[in-house]
Amino acid sequence: AWSFVETQRIDAAFLASVCARAVAARGLFDLQSDGVRLIHGEADGLPGLIVDRYGDTLVAQFLSAGVERWKAAIADALLEATGLHKLYERSDASGREREGLKPVTGWLRGEGATEITIREHGWKLSLDIATGHKTGFYLDQRDSRQRFAELAQHRRFRRVLNCFCYTGGFTVAALAGLQA
């Protein structure tokens, strides 16, 4: 359910208000990053929708038939709420099949490079929104990368071997810590 109010009309105006509220809530935090999850599905009242911001680009996953139906209105609402102009769709998760939806990837609004550099804790991190896992980056590991840099700074380990590198975020964190 997108609303627990029986009389709530589900339309573009309603979706715009939900998107604007979620985007505004993320502005309350100083994340030391220009990579942030703006819409987290059910937690923001939009089940089946994931939206991440990477610099000046939004990346969205429309994972349910409900959000798929309202995709154009949601895309417009997101760009209005953020003031951005680019939205890349990564609706290629296998769960879409259960909803009778085919995988979709590509630019939904605007266009640009799919290889993006974001800033996190003063570091530059590269990702690819077209080929990366889900929307392109593990934003939820921001605090872990910062803690890893702190451990490196205090010389809690002598060497680091990153055998399972995805984007190099932990390697960058270790190097930043060792240089501090």
Describe the role of every protein-language-model region:
Residues 1-55:
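Non-catalytic accessory regions of SAM-dependent methyltransferases
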Residues 11-18, 66, 70-74:
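Short amphipathic alpha-helical segments
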Residues 39-52, 68-137:
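Non-catalytic substrate-recognition/targeting regions of SAM-dependent transferases
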Residues 56, 125, 144, 164:
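Conserved hydrophobic/aromatic pocket- or pore-lining residues that grip, position, or stack substrates
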Residues 57-62:
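Carbohydrate-binding surface patches
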Residues 130-149, 153:
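Conserved SAM-binding loop and adjacent beta-strand
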Residues 145-180:
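Conserved SAM/SAH cofactor-binding pocket of Class I
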